[in-house]
Amino acid sequence: MANSPQARKRARQAENRRQHNAAMRSMVRTYLKKVNAAIASGDQGSAQEAYNQAVSVLDKATRKGKFHPNKAARHKSRLNTKIKAMAA
């Protein structure tokens, strides 16, 4: 266990950050699931709207360092490809 005041503070900060990061990751996953559900339903309009919301949340999480930029780009690319395939 942390003995010095500095170590106790660092442990407190680490726990707060862990909880905040987990909440942000969970929110991103939820938005990605909404896009996939909209794609599965076959409604391109709702899929595009859900995609736009997901991109916003994903980009915000990436700016804050919760996700690697390449991972965010990969998610966006794959979802966009699925939405474009719906139109064809």
Swiss-Prot record:
Which BP terms in the Gene Ontology apply to this protein? translation
Where is composition skewed (Basic residues) in this entry? 69-81
Region Disordered, annotated ranges? 1-23, 69-88
User: Keywords for this entry?
Assistant: Ribonucleoprotein, Ribosomal protein, RNA-binding, rRNA-binding
Pfam families, alphabetically? Ribosomal_S20p (PF01649)
Q: What is this protein called?
A: Small ribosomal subunit protein bS20
Q: What does this protein do, in the record's words?
A: Binds directly to 16S ribosomal RNA.
- What Gene Ontology terms describe what this protein does at the molecular function level? small ribosomal subunit rRNA binding; structural constituent of ribosome
Q: Which SUPFAM superfamilies match?
A: Ribosomal protein S20
Protein family membership: Belongs to the bacterial ribosomal protein bS20 family.
One cellular component term (GO) for this entry is: small ribosomal subunit
